[in-house]
Amino acid sequence: MIAIGNIIADRYKVLKYIGKGGMQNVYKVLDLKLDLELALKTPLPGLESKRFLKSAKIAAKVNHHNVAKTFDYVEENGSIFLAEEYVDGENLEEKLRHFDFLDPHYGACILHNLAKGILASHRAGVIHRDLKPSNVMVSGGVQISNLKITDFGIATLTQEFFDEAAASGDLTRSTSGTIKGALPFMSPELMFGEKGKAIEASTDIWSLGAMMFRLLTGEYPFGVYLDAAVNVKTKNRMDWPNFMTSNPQYQNLSMELQKIIDACLNYDPRSRPTAEDLVKYCETLCYLSEKRFVGRVNNLIQGGISGFIDGIPNNSFFSMESVYGSKTPNTSDRNTVCYSTFEGHPCPRAHPVILWKN
């Protein structure tokens, strides 16, 4: 552990310890030369790699607002460090704790941004290999205003780690927390492919599909840990939940997203869409990206089919037809909701509306 206040490479002052990821410790630092806050990442003991520098050089070529920028690579006292863009927010796995699942408008916005970031990286020759909600940072509170895919800078280290685990036995039976956390989103070719065979960009597309399934349903498409490996092997995927298409207000967009995700989860890597295909398809989707608010349902009227939300800046009217999911808000235990607003009289109209967990 690096002490707070220490200066790395005469440049990076450690401000706080953010936490430990699967393969690295992460610190918030201040770049003393640029007066810029960054995330400084260093591999955990035993995971240092000579290929780390090569990976960092490749990732530094990626310049896109949906990818956390790699700024610097330094070595000091036998340790190696990667300086990456700092995102003041939470990752998608943490954000999902506020929801049972995301509505399709939220989901389409996230998918579109992820696809653009992945496309930029693939064009630079960088394959992530470990895409999952915890590797996607967002800021803006309830908003998805600053989505960044992180850890492209350690892509080579990730592959080396997976290769070493596979060389010592069945990768899917590894006790490593890193691998266990990756399995629900890992492609079949990464789980069960031939040793030494090159991993292609299509593996990221599978992971993106699995991640979007998780965000839109609240469930993992193939389960977790060893169950995920068994179910991927036997092609035993969870069905889409009925609530996604049972409400006419959300049916069309949900069906479009399901079609995209089904294509991403094709077992034949050559049949999956490319990142460019996904960006083009997302550009045809009709989804709302208006600002989101959090408020409390304070009154239901018309026999419970509509009501009002106490929120900022104004109270809003909503219809139960605008509520997404199998559960509906009430004025007791399930009364906090996330929503967008549109002009209405005498008060704004809320849509879409989704339950929010504090």
Language-model-detected regions and their locations in the chain:
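A short, aromatic-enriched beta-strand patch in the conserved N-lobe beta-sheet
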Residues: D72-Y73
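Catalytic-loop of the protein kinase fold
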Residues: V126-S139
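AlphaC helix of the eukaryotic protein kinase fold
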Residues: L44-K61
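Protein kinase glycine-rich loop
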Residues: L15-G21, V26
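Conserved short submotifs of the Hanks-type protein kinase catalytic core
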Residues: N77-N91, K95
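Activation segment signature within eukaryotic-like protein kinase domains
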Residues: I110-L111
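Protein kinase catalytic-loop region centered on the HRD/HxD motif
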Residues: K116-V126
